[in-house]
């Protein structure tokens, strides 16, 4: 979940209050799972297709089935690699 912070100055007490606002966005994991499932349903090798997309940036590696292509384009490719690496290393 992506969060942003909003800082407000309350004039009456002159105190700084920090609010955390959650945006309703799917996590990288949720998006990858949805894309993986869509690719599998269409008979593609999901790992090869996702790797092809990450290396080339060409969204045609990802099927439009179940809106998978639009979903994966919401994430920067470097963010995908970062999340995959973090996940892989945390399991070792």
From Swiss-Prot:
Alphabetical list of InterPro entries matching this protein: IreB
What family, per the record?
Belongs to the UPF0297 family.
HAMAP family with a match to the protein in the record: UPF0297 (MF_01507)
Q: Which NCBIfam families match?
A: PRK05473.1
Q: What is this protein called?
A: UPF0297 protein TTE1249
Q: Native species of this protein?
A: Caldanaerobacter subterraneus subsp. tengcongensis (strain DSM 15242 / JCM 11007 / NBRC 100824 / MB4)
Top-down, what is the taxonomic lineage of the species of origin?
A: Bacteria, Bacillati, Bacillota, Clostridia, Thermoanaerobacterales
């Amino acid at each position: 979940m992506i969060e942003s912070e909003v800082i407000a100055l309350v004039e009456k007490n002159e105190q700084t209050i920090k609010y955390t606002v959650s945006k309703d966005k799917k996590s990288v994991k949720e998006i990858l799972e949805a894309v993986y499932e869509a690719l599998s349903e269409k008979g593609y090798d999901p790992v090869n297709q996702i790797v092809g997309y990450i290396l080339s940036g060409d969204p045609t590696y990802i099927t439009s089935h179940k809106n998978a292509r639009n979903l994966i384009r919401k994430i920067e490719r470097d963010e995908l690699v970062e999340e995959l690496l973090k996940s892989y290393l945390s399991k070792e």
